[in-house]
Amino acid sequence: MKVIQLLPELKIGGVERGTIDLSQHLSKLGHESAVISNGGSLVSLLDQHGAKHFNLPIAKKNLKALSQIKNLRNIYAEFQPDIVHVRSRFPAWINYYALRKLKGKKPIVVSTFHGLYSKPFYSKSMSYADEIIAISKTVQNYIHQNYTVDSKNLHLIYRGCDLEEFNINPLSDAWKDLWYKEFPQTKDKILLTLPGRITSWKGIEAFINLFDHLDTAKFHGIIPGPVAQNKMNYFASLEKLIKEKNLSDHLTFCGARSDIAEIYKVSDIVFNLSSKPEPFGRTIIEAAACGTHVM
């Protein structure tokens, strides 16, 4: 069986990590796996298990990206997928129009709702699928309330994590040496961690404010996660807040990391402080699988 997954980019993130995990599992079962995206740091992980990657500029919501409909159709004609799995709204629109004029046998379309999507019309593309996956009961209920979907085609499949990667095995001395060389300010401190991409609803301000009430001689906070180009102003405002509170020596932004499992293990507590309900907080189960306290 041939399966293609479609998403904007393969950078650090829960959706992206899930895409890699599924691709790896498909390959392990003997299926032919491929991913279409605008690339990113996780593409190399596809190579490790023999999956294909088709680079297509579908990350930005603009007319130029819509011009990729024909190119996507050509990829389908070449790869001949049995299943196309769409994981994001804009790529789902491109997929919808690409399949309309695809000659021959059309693939089964599966979509995964990874969030409580606003803009119902724009998000409607995710409902244009033969089978739909909701990653939690919250998301499942939201789909029923906002979209016209047949219940028999809507499947509740909770997200999980790879227990081969997220486990209680001890950290290697080599990794610890590299970590403390890069972040010496974290050594011999109670390490508090707020993982996730830099965005306003992740509770980063609350995490920063927490340090007003802590003995900073004992505690250090780290925030591992990528900063998108359109979030640079928000990121700058966070850095300003930290500076105003004289916390620059006690809070560290780590950027996008490929060693997040090790970061969970070196942490004393991993936080999830999202200011609105998360569809599914993947960082919580990942950290718990590593034996780290979660708050």
Where is each model-derived feature located?
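Acidic donor-binding loop of glycosyltransferase active sites
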Residues: 250, 265-279, 292-293
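Active-site donor-binding acidic/aromatic loop of nucleotide-activated sugar
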Residues: 230-235, 248-257, 263
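A conserved, positively charged/aromatic
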Residues: 76, 100-137, 141, 148
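Short hydrophobic beta-strand element within catalytic cores of glycosyltransferases
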Residues: 35, 293-295
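A short helix/loop element that forms part of the nucleotide-sugar donor recognition site in Leloir-type
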Residues: 167-185, 238-239
